[in-house]
């Protein structure tokens, strides 16, 4: 069972990192097998963050608190950035959405880029 969590709402009085981590610990206890960390209801971008993987501080905090795999989604458009996020331990898996919509060969090109 996978759960996608809008961990960062970017809204006044919205979810905090502590809220997200606490929720993920409870989800793991309830039997969730994988958590996908993404933005929240306030939009799909994060104000003040333009780096690829702009929810990586949330995924890192969640990863430190749970023993199940954590997937990071958010602005990841380049294979090298995805690989760097994985290698640095920010997440166990990377979610790519809009980049695939823009380029149907994204996955094939990404494999070539990191090999």
Task: Give names to the regions the model predicted.
Residues 1-115:
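Flavin-dependent oxidoreductase catalytic cores
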């Amino acid at each position: 069972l996978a759960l996608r969590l809008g961990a960062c709402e970017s809204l006044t009085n919205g979810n905090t990192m502590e809220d997200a981590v606490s929720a993920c610990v409870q989800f793991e206890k309830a039997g969730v097998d994988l958590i996908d960390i993404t933005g929240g209801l306030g939009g799909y971008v994060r104000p003040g963050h333009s780096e690829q993987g702009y929810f990586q501080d949330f995924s890192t905090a969640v990863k430190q608190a749970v023993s199940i795999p954590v997937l990071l989604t958010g602005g990841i458009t380049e294979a090298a950035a995805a690989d760097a996020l994985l290698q640095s331990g920010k997440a166990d898996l990377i979610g790519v959405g809009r980049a695939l919509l823009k380029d149907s060969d994204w996955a094939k090109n990404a494999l070539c880029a990191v090999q």
